[in-house]
């Protein structure tokens, strides 16, 4: 295998000794560039060793601990065999999220590490760069609460309340104000509970910092740190700013979980970057501060979150659009009524009462309350499934999601290393290779990393190796060396033989053996070919070798390992496809690893390096071609945070509703940008704050279950909105004609009760039995309005027939044994309440049984409306039972007609095309040619970029 092929074996330095070559890894490239840039400051590198430091490294203290009982350690690990480790395997890229940060000139970073900055220089830089803190935008809670009283529907409700107060109709005033307050309170509470991303980010920041100033090591408040400061890092230190390590020959382990969500510590050396809010686990070093405040990685993440959150939610747009159209219709109806009244010289008080009645019924005052309640009940149900909804509108967004951009580790995979079938050279048994690899592992529980845990857990499959392991005595143990990329242990066999065991990056282990003696050509070739094969398939691999006594080094073989897919992921992905959901994997891992994972899951293998998106200067595709490229890709590997943001943005510009999963601060911008941001199990507080939904259960199946539930909730909301718009149109048409033609109207109090009954009964739709759609759902507003208008017209015709046939001068159907107000109130109430049974069904109204809550609420309201009519409450007279029965029978007939119309409209593709302004019959030949040409263009683009 050539050196070029060897370098294609891509591994990550922060994942210990799994690496054959660091040259290809983007994280390493970032570190390398940092090193090269820091080398311009020769004084920093030459004098770093002269800086006064505290002695005693944490690792030295660790070595003083006695070895734990190996049997007990293995048993404890194997008792949890098959469970996911806490240590993440995905390397999350933290190169930056925003190209607009303020870059500190290199001359300001050339500080002498032995002396630090002078007090005068600190003052100058603080004036230039400001304090080391993130900018705050304090928004008054009162103003935020008052904003929930702003909107088309709210304006109409407020106008109606003022008009009712002018007419001294205090009952109406109270009802309207109560609905306004309910809507505002529910919305405000939900937004307040979601919290502030900036507040969560601030919780991760340090309070103090130890720096060198004027040659003295002093402790200062963290917000006084300035760029160019020499800052001390030691075990337990929380980095107060971004910086670059200037101490040579240092070795730090940094906990970046507050940023990346990954619990496995990252290794840092001379020239590497350290990010604000990272915690030093072991080691000591000094760093030069490169960015402070809003210019740090955390600060830029918060800024990008702010940019993403400035867009109005899709659900809010829909409700506002509906409200505006209804407001226009109300104004048109009022103009008709006013014109008729002026020609008849109707009194001003009567005109105002007519105006109040049209205003109340013209705009669904309870629409926000019912929809909010429906989503709140759905959110409570999702919480029982360990999905915490932080923003109610996210339920509607999730129901319409067409593409899910998912991370790999923990969501698609188990988040634990698993060993696969080992490759052994001729004459070596798998048990022998496993024994040697486990001998070269730490015996301390605290010192175990993900690799050692995977080996010790897997001993259950190698009983001979497990039995032999306890018989060896460890004489020396040398943990992972970042230079030689190996772990070394010197042990004594039961026979007293001294054996040196190593495991590490395969090519480095091979080099160790080759330096001792020539390896047979066939063994050498087979070994390298196996390493190359594993690399191409995305496996990480460990080479294993040993040296017995004074003999030669022996190459034993290679142990491949991988973070395996979750057991339910492949099945869940198939289910997602059946639900019309496309899944794209975005991972920080190498392309080979990403492709192998996708192959095992059946996700597709069109996986590309994220550099092709062009953010790092590697892309040259024009806008439309880039959009096609992203749309047809199955995923991207080696992604930085800005790549995730860009992918979401491109897909949204193509008209897709996109969901994004994430767990770290670096994911916060893309979580906020996505239509539905999903914080997965174990996410940082900042990621949770930026997300719309937080999942406490691991895996993709939890997300798919929530998606199905959200579609059920959407079905309830959609059916209610169709129902409620139809009711408003019904009464606008009917009352408008009644006033304009007959100069009469229903009593204003009964109009208010009709509005209240309509919303009180349907509040329980939140608990209704609802199906979930087999594909992403959308509002399809033209179709929604078409159905609502037709249903409203049918209702208006039914009411007009009731008015003009039951009350004739010489005796109608009711033959004057009933009060007009009471009979019309009952007929309107019954037909409107029953309409919900029509719109809630996916097919004929009898095909789906409503929940007992909805059926009970509607029946209860019907009984109350009947009592109103029988006893003449708010009517001029009582109505006999025979007339009431006739009204019920007539209303049932109207209900059946409504059901027939709705079924035809909901199943007719021609109606859908007509409402959306398309021809009734699609020209298939033209459409087929267009689809074929578009597909060929996309395939050509994909082939060109993959070659």
Curated annotation (Swiss-Prot):
Chain intervals with Acidic residues compositional bias: 62-74
Gene behind the chain: PMA2
Primary localization class, coarse: membrane
InterPro entries hit by this protein: ATPase_P-typ_cation-transptr_N, ATPase_P-typ_cyto_dom_N, ATPase_P-typ_P_site, ATPase_P-typ_TM_dom_sf, ATPase_P-typ_transduc_dom_A_sf, HAD-like_sf, HAD_sf, P-type_ATPase_IIIA
Organism: Saccharomyces cerevisiae (strain ATCC 204508 / S288c)
PANTHER family assigned to the protein according to its UniProt record, in alphabetical order: CALCIUM-TRANSPORTING ATPASE
Keyword DNA-binding included in the entry's annotation: no
NCBIfam families referenced in this protein's UniProt entry, alphabetically: ATPase-IIIA_H, ATPase_P-type
Membrane topology: Multi-pass membrane protein
Protein name per Swiss-Prot or TrEMBL: Plasma membrane ATPase 2
Sequence ranges of Basic and acidic residues compositional bias: 7-22
């Amino acid at each position: 295998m050539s050196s070029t092929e060897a370098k294609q074996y891509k591994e990550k330095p922060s994942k210990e000794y799994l690496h054959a070559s660091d040259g290809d890894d983007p994280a390493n490239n970032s570190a390398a560039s940092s090193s090269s840039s820091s080398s311009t400051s020769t004084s920093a590198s030459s004098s770093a060793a002269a800086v006064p430091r505290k002695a005693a490294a944490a690792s030295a203290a660790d070595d003083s601990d006695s070895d734990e009982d190996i049997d007990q350690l293995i048993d404890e690990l194997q008792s949890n065999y098959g469970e996911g480790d806490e240590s993440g395997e995905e390397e999350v890229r933290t190169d930056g999220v925003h190209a607009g940060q303020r870059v500190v000139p290199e001359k300001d970073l050339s500080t002498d590490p032995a002396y630090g900055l002078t007090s005068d220089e600190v003052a100058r830089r603080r004036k230039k760069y400001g304090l080391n803190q993130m900018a705050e935008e304090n928004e008054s809670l009162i103003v935020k609460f008052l904003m929930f009283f702003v909107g088309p529907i709210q304006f109409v409700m407020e106008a109606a309340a003022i008009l009712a107060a002018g007419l001294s109709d205090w009952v109406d005033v109270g009802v309207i104000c109560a609905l306004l307050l309910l809507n505002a309170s529910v919305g405000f509470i939900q937004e307040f509970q979601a919290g502030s991303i900036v507040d969560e980010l601030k919780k991760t920041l340090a309070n103090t910092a130890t720096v060198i100033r004027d040659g003295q090591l002093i402790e200062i408040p963290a917000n006084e740190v300035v760029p160019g400061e020499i800052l001390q890092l030691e075990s337990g230190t929380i980095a107060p700013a971004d910086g670059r390590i200037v101490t040579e020959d240092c070795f730090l382990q940094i906990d970046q979980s507050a940023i990346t969500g990954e619990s496995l510590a990252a290794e840092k050396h001379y020239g590497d970057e350290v990010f604000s809010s990272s915690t030093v686990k072991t080691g000591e070093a000094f760093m030069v501060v490169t960015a402070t405040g809003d210019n740090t990685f955390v600060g830029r993440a918060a800024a990008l979150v702010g940019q993403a959150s400035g867009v109005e939610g899709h659900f809010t747009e829909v409700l506002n659009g509906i409200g505006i159209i209804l407001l226009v219709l109300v104004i048109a109806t009022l103009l008709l009524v006013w014109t008729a009244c002026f020609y008849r010289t109707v009194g001003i008080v009567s005109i105002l009462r007519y105006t109040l009645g049209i205003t109340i019924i013209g705009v669904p005052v309870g629409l926000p309350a019912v929809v909010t309640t429906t989503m709140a009940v759905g959110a409570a149900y999702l919480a029982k499934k360990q999905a915490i909804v932080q923003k109610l509108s996210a339920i509607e967004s999730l129901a319409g999601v067409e593409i899910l951009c998912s991370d790999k580790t923990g969501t698609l995979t188990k988040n634990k290393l698993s060993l696969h079938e080992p490759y052994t050279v001729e004459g070596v048994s798998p048990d022998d290779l496993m024994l040697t690899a486990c001998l070269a592992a730490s015996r301390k529980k605290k010192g175990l990393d993900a690799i050692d845990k995977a080996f010790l857990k897997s001993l259950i499959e190698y009983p001979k190796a497990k039995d032999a392991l306890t018989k060896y005595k460890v004489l020396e143990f040398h943990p992972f060396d970042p230079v030689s990329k190996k772990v070394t242990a010197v042990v004594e066999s039961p026979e007293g033989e001294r054996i040196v065991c190593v495991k590490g990056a395969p090519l480095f282990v091979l080099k160790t053996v080759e330096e001792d003696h020539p390896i047979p050509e066939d063994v050498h070739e087979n070994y390298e070919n196996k390493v190359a094969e594993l690399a191409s398939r995305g496996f990480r691999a460990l080479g294993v070798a040993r040296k017995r006594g004074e003999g030669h080094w022996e190459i034993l073989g290679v142990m491949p390992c991988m973070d395996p897919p979750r057991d339910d992921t492949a099945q869940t992905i198939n289910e997602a496809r059946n639900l019309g959901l496309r899944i794209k994997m975005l991972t920080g891992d190498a392309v080979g690893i990403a492709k192998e994972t996708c192959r095992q899951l059946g996700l597709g293998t069109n996986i590309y390096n994220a550099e092709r998106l062009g953010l790092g200067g590697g892309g040259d595709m024009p806008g439309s071609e880039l959009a096609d490229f992203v749309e047809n890709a199955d995923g991207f590997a080696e992604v930085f945070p800005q790549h995730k943001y860009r992918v979401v943005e491109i897909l949204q510009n193509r008209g897709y509703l996109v969901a994004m999963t994430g767990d770290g601060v670096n994911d916060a911008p893309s979580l906020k940008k996505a239509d539905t941001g999903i914080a997965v199990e174990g996410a940082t507080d900042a990621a949770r704050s930026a997300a719309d939904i937080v999942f406490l259960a691991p895996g993709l199946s939890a997300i798919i279950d929530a998606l199905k539930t959200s579609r059920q909730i959407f079905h309830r909301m959609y059916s209610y909105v169709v129902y409620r718009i139809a009711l408003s149109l019904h009464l606008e048409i009917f009352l408008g004609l009644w006033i304009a033609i007959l100069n009469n109207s229903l009593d204003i109090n009964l109009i208010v009760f009709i509005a209240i009954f309509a919303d009180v009964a349907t509040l329980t739709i939140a608990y209704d039995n609802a199906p979930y759609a087999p594909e992403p759902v959308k509002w399809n507003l033209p179709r929604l309005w078409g159905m609502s208008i037709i249903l409203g017209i049918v209702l208006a015709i039914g009411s007009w027939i009731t008015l003009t046939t039951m009350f004739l001068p010489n005796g109608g159907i009711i033959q004057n044994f009933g009060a007009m107000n009471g009979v019309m109130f009952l007929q309107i109430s019954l037909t409107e309440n029953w309409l919900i049974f029509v719109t809630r069904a996916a097919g004929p109204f009898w095909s789906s049984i409503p929940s007992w809550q909805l059926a009970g609420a509607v029946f209860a309201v019907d009984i109350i409306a009947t009592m109103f009519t029988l006893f003449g409450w708010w009517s001029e007279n009582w109505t006999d039972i025979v007339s009431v029965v006739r009204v019920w029978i007539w209303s049932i007939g109207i209900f059946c007609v409504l059901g027939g119309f709705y079924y035809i409209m909901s199943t007719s593709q021609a109606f859908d095309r007509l409402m959306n302004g398309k021809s009734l019959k699609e020209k298939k030949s033209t459409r087929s040619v267009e689809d074929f040409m578009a597909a060929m263009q996309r395939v050509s683009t994909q082939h060109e970029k993959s070659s």
